[in-house]
Amino acid sequence: MNQIQPIITATLAAGSTASPFLLTLNVTQQLCETTCADAPIIFTPSVSVDEWAQVDTGLYVVTCHVDGICSYTPCQGGPCCTRTQLVAGAFTVPVYAAKAPTAVTITTGQTINTVSADPCHRCSRLLVSETPVILTVQ
């Protein structure tokens, strides 16, 4: 199991002030081994709503869970050396609503994955994944 937890942030899109809310989900994860920045990396996160709770008058917090398997080829490895790594964590989204939500759903768009590497280095251990998300509060 991966001991290094991912950094997960959800950023509200400009102008998204009412449900459905448009978000960009960013998952940054340190990989167990270095991989080439130009090599394909596969990570398709599964995102689900865990719960929502009232934290103040008209203010609710939606807790979501992200998980998936990252598949990559380490540097110095060939196509037979593919590694997999579990990526899992949670994030929260604050929601203002006049009445308590009765249902909260989440859908995802197409994920874009990159390996973040300095210009002078061709290998890195840092996965950066971005996924568009629609959060619907009813």
Enumerate the predicted regions with their spans:
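Viral structural modules
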Residues: 1-138
